[in-house]
Regions:
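Extended, hydrophobic alpha-helical membrane-active domains that insert into or remodel lipid bilayers
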Residues: 1-192, 202-206
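Long, low-complexity, intrinsically disordered regions
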Residues: 94-99, 167-176, 185, 189-266
């Protein structure tokens, strides 16, 4: 996953030139970047397990967005502790492997984590109020949240907004009306990330735009369009193995919270 993400960024930087892309991927600074990302991802996963945060975490395993600790499963104090701890860990490892100023790297990491957390919380809130906002309101809200979070993190505002819009537009074709496994949910997040990256490339033509758009689209998918974990657990429990009942309960739930899965329901 790390290599695919880096390859996508490199392809954008080289304007689609395959030979130049392969050349840039073999450079020492690119290798260092990949090694750093892998080291940070592994260390942060260990930190989550040590602190007990892994039991309450939502999301996937991409180090760019991380497994975010949403406040519907944790307190603001826990979220703040985790953001600060992750910033220290990622900046320390980044400085050790790639060099540079620790203070500068820490500021960058802290703002990046704050931006991602803000986006996840915003998408979660938008998902909870989908019935009030409607489709147009959700699209507008996601665009605003994506732009603000990108500004906080120092990313591309245009790319982030494009990614959020792309995730909403692609929603109907990506989802269906059944509760799927965690692996399926992860695949959906990666599809949204890919769609967002392409939208960012078209909108900005820059690597920064591709990264911001991909992150934005993935966060919209994880924390808004998919039913929340507690909701899917409750629906499965009520259905008690009855597939027809499961579909009816999901249909009712989606219409209640205005999740995108309702678009494909009969």
């Amino acid at each position: 996953t790390l290599f695919r993400s880096q390859a996508a960024v490199s392809l954008a930087e080289n304007q689609g030139n395959i030979s130049k892309t392969f050349g840039s991927l073999s450079r020492s600074d690119t290798v260092k970047s990949i090694v750093t990302s892998m080291a940070v991802a592994g260390t942060l996963q260990g930190l989550d397990q040590f602190m007990g945060w892994d039991q309450a975490i939502q999301g996937g395993t991409l180090p760019t967005t991380g497994k975010l600790l949403a406040t519907d499963n944790a307190t603001w104090t826990q979220v703040a502790q985790r953001v600060a701890s992750q910033s220290v860990v990622s900046s320390t490892l980044g400085t050790a492997i790639q060099g540079g100023s620790f203070i500068d790297n820490f500021k960058t990491a802290l703002l990046s984590h704050i931006g991602s957390q803000f986006h996840a919380e915003g998408a979660n809130l938008i998902g909870d109020n989908g019935a009030i906002l409607g489709h147009a309101g959700k699209v507008l809200s996601h665009s605003v949240v994506a732009g603000v979070s990108a500004e906080i993190a120092g990313g591309s505002v245009t790319g982030a907004v494009a990614g959020a819009l792309a995730a909403e537009i692609a929603a109907i074709s990506l989802n269906d009306n059944l509760i799927k496994t965690e692996q399926w949910r992860e695949q959906q997040a990666q599809k949204s990330r890919l769609v967002g990256a392409f939208a960012g490339l078209v909108a900005t033509g820059k690597a920064e735009g591709v990264i911001s758009a991909a992150n934005s689209a993935e966060l919209v998918e994880r924390y808004n369009r998919q039913l929340h974990l507690e909701e899917t657990k409750a629906i499965n429990k009520l259905a008690n193995g009855d597939k027809n009942k499961l579909e009816r309960l999901l249909a009712a739930s989606c219409r209640k919270v205005y999740c995108i899965a309702q678009e494909s329901l009969n």
